[in-house]
Amino acid sequence: MAINDQNLIWVDLEMTGLDPETHKIIEIASIVTDAQLNILAEGPVIAIHQPEEELAKMDNWCTNTHTNSGLVARVQESKYDEEAAIAETIAFLEQWVPKGVSPICGNSIGQDRRFLYKHMPRLEEYFHYRYVDVSTIKELARRWKPEVLDGFTKAGTHLALDDIRESIAELKYYRQHIFTI
């Protein structure tokens, strides 16, 4: 374990919906990689307790997906609130990356950041203002080199840790097939 300002912080959230004004975070996970995308450590995977009235706001897609994955049951049984999840996640990150240095990394990470800003501002402040958004590369590939997209498939479990692992693998794939860096 070594703090390094070149390490990257990967985050994924699962939420009760897409609107941070009306929906809540129900799971958070994080991974730290080095600059070459090698996984250095997996952070805590935390289901965040939400009351039944918040879970009832989920649409059919969220309800089915998060029930079938077991996440709804984990949320109902969880003893973690948002503050405890923030504290545990920051304690993990502090071992690997100084505050304010790493961009927030992930797939469609702007959406996750909106939720962090609204519901976990202390954690959101831990990241640099920049993003490494794998979905941006996917959208550019779709337009400029669509044949590349056929070579990478996601399982799509919609569990936070699985999603981060897939995002890292996807970026490695794009690095190999698109970038000559």
From Swiss-Prot:
<comment type="function">
    <text>3'-to-5' exoribonuclease specific for small oligoribonucleotides.</text>
</comment>
<dbReference type="InterPro" id="IPR012337">
    <property type="entry name" value="RNaseH-like_sf"/>
</dbReference>
<dbReference type="InterPro" id="IPR022894">
    <property type="entry name" value="Oligoribonuclease"/>
</dbReference>
<dbReference type="InterPro" id="IPR013520">
    <property type="entry name" value="Exonuclease_RNaseT/DNA_pol3"/>
</dbReference>
<keyword id="KW-0540">Nuclease</keyword>
<dbReference type="GO" id="GO:0006259">
    <property type="term" value="P:DNA metabolic process"/>
</dbReference>
<keyword id="KW-0269">Exonuclease</keyword>
<dbReference type="GO" id="GO:0000175">
    <property type="term" value="F:3'-5'-RNA exonuclease activity"/>
</dbReference>
<keyword id="KW-0378">Hydrolase</keyword>
<dbReference type="GO" id="GO:0005737">
    <property type="term" value="C:cytoplasm"/>
</dbReference>
<feature type="active site">
    <location>
        <position position="129"/>
    </location>
</feature>
<protein>
    <recommendedName>
        <fullName>Oligoribonuclease</fullName>
        <ecNumber>3.1.15.-</ecNumber>
    </recommendedName>
</protein>
<dbReference type="Pfam" id="PF00929">
    <property type="entry name" value="RNase_T"/>
</dbReference>
<feature type="domain" description="Exonuclease">
    <location>
        <begin position="8"/>
        <end position="171"/>
    </location>
</feature>
<keyword id="KW-0963">Cytoplasm</keyword>
<dbReference type="GO" id="GO:0003676">
    <property type="term" value="F:nucleic acid binding"/>
</dbReference>
<comment type="similarity">
    <text>Belongs to the oligoribonuclease family.</text>
</comment>
<dbReference type="InterPro" id="IPR036397">
    <property type="entry name" value="RNaseH_sf"/>
</dbReference>
